[in-house]
A protein has these predicted regions:
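Acidic/polar, low-complexity intrinsically disordered N-terminal segments immediately downstream
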Residues: 19-117, 189-203, 464-465
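Long, acidic/polar, low-complexity amphipathic helices and coiled-coil-like
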Residues: 88-248
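Hydrophobic/aromatic beta-strand elements that line small-molecule binding cavities or substrate pockets
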Residues: 77-83, 106-109, 148-157, 251-253, ...
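Ser/Thr/Gly/Pro-rich, low-complexity flexible regions
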Residues: 169-171, 176-179, 187-188, 194-465
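Sec-dependent signal peptide recognition
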Residues: 2-8
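C-terminal motif of bacterial Sec signal peptides marking the signal peptidase cleavage site
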Residues: 14-17
Length: 465
């Protein structure tokens, strides 16, 4: 027995002597030390740029709120950022004119998550379009979503920090927004700090000084109708191609210190437009002068479209008639630079308070209806008076749509005569004007009607379902 015990003890001693200890160091560094060194290298990359960075963020059109998704318009935003080695970042933003004028400093951090991540961890300009309150973010997605932008990003290049170039790519950790840091030049930094983004906001605002709906850009001998949507940050170009067909390109835009840039270039044959710059307003001639690349162009008002879409009104009417519902306008007619020129949004009577202005194709068999929709309590209903229309609209040879009044009484006596001189009477007179409308389709569920007299009066329709 003693021999057996000594044998077992000897084997155990040999086993202990042969046991290998696992060493996870590489070049003398533990995993934690290697991670810390890598994160420090990322930070050094950001802070070593002497003139800062331009950060371009683009969304996918999907926003998430606690795992629930909502779809809406895409947006592209531009920021100027200067990082310090103390974890602070100073930025400017093109999201709002106030953010373009005043630099804001907040904190950032670089952490190891699934991948190394750049996290803006205190409220900054980057957080504003993410804000769940639509009163802050102006989000079209609804409460809780923001624009589908992010403020935590993973480095997405397939190289380590030491091999990153002057452009660094990111993916947002919540909404999968795409981010791109581009090392700024001294000229770009100077332009940002001199307030050029704010000046470009002002320059784009000069378009509102052109009272006509149709803004005609002449560039390199080519004419375009352009429409700037500052809410969804989209500019739409419409032109006529060599075959005489209408072509349209709607592109997101963003503003940097050196110009209004298009996320996607507008390509028309041999002409490519990547953005516009140097916007100068001449009040005497109501002309906005711009540059695009090496070319100088002008934007002026036009009383007619570059080419009328002769079938747009029919598409508009048929869509509502087929779906058994109405087109809605939130504020009625815009006239000579004034939104809600007739004061329809203040309309209040025994029917309730104004909610929409509606045009209802084929409301009853053989009759259309142009009428305010009123809110009373929690219910929507028709105003006590409106105007009947004779369907469908008549399309003239030059592409105008004419709407014919059927009077303001009928439908079994439901409606009473319209009070003269009020917002409904003025709206009726414009809607059924003998001048007719040029109809512009923005997308499947959005149209604008432009009064053909001088293109200074229009109404915008959206599909409310």
């Amino acid at each position: 027995m003693k021999k057996i015990f000594l044998y077992i003890l000897a084997v155990m001693t040999i086993g202990v002597g042969c046991r290998k200890t696992y060493n996870d160091t590489i070049q003398g560094q533990t995993p934690d030390q290697r991670v810390a060194a890598a994160l420090a290298a990322y930070q050094k990359k950001l802070t070593a740029a002497p003139y800062g960075w331009i950060f371009i963020e683009s969304t996918t059109g999907i926003a998430y709120n606690q795992g629930v998704s909502s779809t809406g318009p895409k947006i592209v935003l531009a920021y100027y950022m200067q990082f310090t080695d103390s974890g602070r970042v100073t930025m400017l933003s093109d999201f709002d004119p106030s953010m373009a004028a005043t630099p804001k400093t907040s904190s950032y951090n670089i952490k190891q998550l699934t991948r190394p991540a750049l996290i803006f961890d205190t409220y900054s300009y980057l957080h504003v379009p993410c804000d769940p309150d639509p009163n802050v973010s102006h989000s079209p997605f609804g409460f809780g979503y923001g624009w589908g932008t992010d403020f935590e990003f993973s480095f997405s290049d397939s190289v380590g920090a030491a091999n990153l170039g002057d452009t660094i790519n990111f993916i947002g950790n919540l909404n999968n927004a795409r981010g791109k840091l581009i090392k700024a030049t001294q000229a770009q930094q100077t332009a940002y700090l001199a307030g050029n983004v704010l000046q470009l906001f002002t320059g784009a605002g000069y378009l509102n000084n052109i009272l006509q709906y149709f803004k005609r850009l002449s560039l390199g001998g080519v004419g375009y109708d352009i429409h700037l949507d500052p809410v969804d940050r989209v500019v739409t170009f419409t032109w006529v191609d060599a075959s005489g067909n209408i072509q349209t390109a709607a592109v997101n835009y963003y503003i940097t210190g050196t110009g209004i840039q298009f996320a996607t270039p507008v390509v028309n044959g041999n002409q490519t437009i990547t953005g516009i710059d140097n916007l100068t307003w001449d009040a005497g001639s109501s002309t906005l002068t711009v540059t695009s690349g090496s070319q100088t162009g002008t934007i002026t008002g036009a009383s007619t479209p570059i080419k009328a879409d002769a079938t747009a009104a029919t598409r508009w009417w048929n869509y509502a008639a087929r779906n058994g519902y109405f087109w809605a306008s939130g504020s009625g007619f815009h006239v000579n630079g004034v939104d809600d020129a007739y004061g329809v949004t203040a309309l209040t009577n025994s029917s309730g308070s104004f909610y929409y202005y509606a045009y209802w194709p084929n409301f009853n068999s053989g009759v259309d209806l142009f009428v305010p929709i009123m809110l009373q309590g929690n219910s929507l209903g028709l105003n006590a008076y409106g105007e009947l229309g004779v369907p469908p609209p008549f399309i003239t040879g030059d592409g105008r749509a004419l709407f014919t009044s059927g009077g303001d009484v009928g439908l079994g006596g439901t409606f009473t005569p319209t009070p003269p001189g009020g917002p409904v009477a003025k709206s009726n007179a414009t809607m059924f004007s003998s001048a007719g409308f040029y109809v512009v389709q923005n997308n499947e569920k959005s149209y604008d009607f432009v009064l053909a007299t001088d293109a200074k009066t229009w109404i915008s329709w959206f599909w409310p379902q």
